[in-house]
Amino acid sequence: MTVLEAIQKSAEFLGKKNVEAPRLQAELLLAHLLKMPRMKLYLNFDRALTVAETDALRECIKRRGQREPLQHINGSTSFCGFEMTVNRHALIPRPETEQLAELGWQFLATINHQPSICLDFCTGSGCIAIAIAAKCPNAKIVAADISREALALAQENAAQNKLAERIEFLQGDGFAALAAGAQFDLIVSNPPYIPSAEIETLEPEVRDFDPRLALDGGADGLNFYRLVAAQAKPFLKPDGKLMLEFGDGQADAIKKIFESEKWIVEAVREDYSQRARILVARL
Ligand SMILES: C[S@@+](CC[C@H](N)C(=O)[O-])C[C@H]1O[C@@H](n2cnc3c(N)ncnc32)[C@H](O)[C@@H]1O
């Protein structure tokens, strides 16, 4: 079977399994397997696959047909240009979260006293902490999560990106993970925000493969925003900022939660599709 035939056959199979963008997915899986950029496949359409390559591709396509995410099959994804290993213990880093990380490192860059210190609350794979650490060479980052398995992955990702010495990993439930008296210039978080009952309606790639702990924001999806609004103040320095990602359609409710806890809501930022997705607040 040639590269082109393999792509066509795989795309047809994935299409029947209702996988979105089946041809692209087939190409990405084959390119990863052959260790070449996707575009290079186009120069190799006539190349014959070996038996071992065909068997490996068949296995990958079977898994993708069962709606396992591409990132889990390939074992990694890119976040702000940094390579992140992914597994079932942490949310796959999403492109929209890159904007939160960028706002975070832009703010830390304006701080005069150095080193600045940042908390990534609910760190998961560690993607936000790692991107900010990489972009702010003077910053120290604390990355907290309730899941030991997610923290093990985050530590692996920090080491892989040669940033382990500037990121401290803390396990615990909410702010109980932190030492009393700890204070940060920036608290950044992408917490779980899906209403519990909506989880069953999500695509299988999310519903069956992202950990429920990373998705479930309680009955209305807003539990973590109430928690942060009520408990984060003592952990923020007087000139510090809080930046939180939230779900599409949650902006008004979240703004109200923070204002009723006497936070100053500085901005609600939109993503590239003009949907409000990030809250910026201060004391
Ligand atoms: C939506 S994921 C975000 C992961 C990562 N920050 C990202 O943007 O890809 C939320 C994370 O919150 C963690 N989490 C859930 N409940 C928690 C709690 N009570 N205290 C601390 N972390 C919690 C989960 O383990 C998960 O890693």
How would you describe each model-predicted region?
Residues 163, 210, 236-238:
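Helix-to-beta-strand junctions that scaffold the AdoMet/dcAdoMet cofactor pocket
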Residues 95-201:
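Conserved SAM/SAH cofactor-binding pocket of Class I
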